[in-house]
Design a protein with these regions (language model features):
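Generic helix N-cap/helix-start motif at coil->alpha-helix transitions
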Residues: 2-4, 41
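Non-catalytic C-terminal accessory modules of carbohydrate-active enzymes
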Residues: 9-147, 151, 157-183
Length: 183
């Protein structure tokens, strides 16, 4: 059969290699009740990822173990940490998206270490991978040591290439984070 759990691994690797469009194509192949896997054939609930799909004649496309799988967790990680690029880091959230080229915008809200982060990622040039230029609460994140104002840069120099680090504020507030993918 087709083991779906590993699909999440492939999505993450596609994103690590800068292939956001491929990552989305892979995710769509195993989405519940999608064109490739209609619930009428698979027998799975239309809102639940399955562990695997059968390739045996007579059972082709039937799903197994839809409620006992890590597939949903790994695919969520592929979407959230891979495509949207929102990753936990020791110093805060690192946001380095790998978008499907067709995506112009995506947003998410993340609770992290005592604060909420409303994150909007914009991709007007339809890049799969670009340099994230980040603002937090209206202030541009620039290079410098991690705790300089207000964000750090993995390269720690004075360029505008924000290495994607948004600090962990831990203040109980909601912070507005805007990410612009640039060349």
């Amino acid at each position: 059969g087709v083991y779906c759990h590993a699909t999440g691994f492939k999505i993450l690797m596609d994103c690590k290699c800068g292939r956001g469009t491929k990552a989305l194509e892979t995710l769509k192949k195993i989405m519940p009740d999608s064109g490739k896997n209609p619930s009428s054939r698979s027998g799975a609930e239309p809102y639940v990822f399955t562990n695997c799909y059968s390739t045996n004649p007579g059972y082709y496309g039937k799903s197994y173990q839809s409620w006992t799988t890590g597939t949903s967790a790994w695919c969520m990680m592929g979407l959230y940490e891979g495509m949207m690029g929102i990753k936990r880091d020791y110093d805060g959230l690192r946001i380095v998206p790998c978008f499907p080229a067709a995506w112009e915008e995506a947003e998410a809200t993340r609770h992290f270490r005592g604060a909420d982060y409303h994150i909007v990622i914009r991709n007007p040039k339809h890049l799969e991978k670009g340099k994230p230029v980040i603002t937090v609460d209206g202030s541009l994140c620039v290079g410098g040591p991690v705790n300089s104002s207000p964000c750090g840069d993995e390269r720690r120099d004075d360029s505008l290439y924000a290495g994607g680090l948004v600090p962990a504020f831990g203040d109980g507030k909601t912070h507005e984070v805007e990410v612009l993918l640039s060349e």
